[in-house]
Amino acid sequence: GGFRSALDALGGFECVGFCEIDKYAKRAYETLYDTKGERYFEDARNIDPDDLPDIDLICAGFPCQSFSIAGKQRGFDDTRGTLFFEVARIAAAKRPALLFLENVRNLLSHDKGRTFETILEVLDDIGYDVSWMVLNSANFGVPQSRNRVFITGFLRGRCAGEIFAFSQTNPKTLEQRLPGREGNRVYAADGLAITQTSSAGGFAGRTGLYVIPI
């Protein structure tokens, strides 16, 4: 729902459908957003473009596990990694003016850059000019440091423009309020969250405690 949240805040967009294979994530999405009348697709591989209305924008955060440094990095050899091609298939059929894609930063360097080169070639073949940039959520008011690559595709001959003219906006970090062991640390909630030590013991060792104003 990250794309949906941002576009709702921006205004001027109407969501006509969404795709989510995880039943719990789907339930959360439907709790957060009014999806009445929207088309729902469980599996991107089974989407028939003829079931979609004309659309101006496709947003897709295709699965990152296949490209993340935290995983096995099997790339397109992992079924999850091939879901990008489903996005391209639908885009080729529906020809939206814009594509907005997101994934982990390591997508750029995975397989010595060959994976990202394939993505660029596919988007070029279906008629999209592409730009991309790595952005950190910490610079946009989110209390965590999370780098992601954002890719925009502009339908050639129909849409063109520039994007990603961003600057640092939220350099604050969390203040440690109470000293002590990893499991006993308490932080203020007005800055960036620290990365917890997964092997720390004790109460809240893996999550941390935050002072939240009420």
Protein language model features and the residues they cover:
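SAM cofactor-binding core of SAM-dependent methyltransferases
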Residues: 1-45
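Short, hydrophobic/glycine-enriched beta-strand segments
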Residues: 2, 57-59
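Generic enzyme active-site microenvironment
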Residues: 18, 41, 59, 100-101
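Class I S-adenosyl-L-methionine
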Residues: 47-57, 65-214
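Glycine-rich, N-terminal phosphate-binding loop of Rossmann-like dinucleotide-binding domains
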Residues: 62
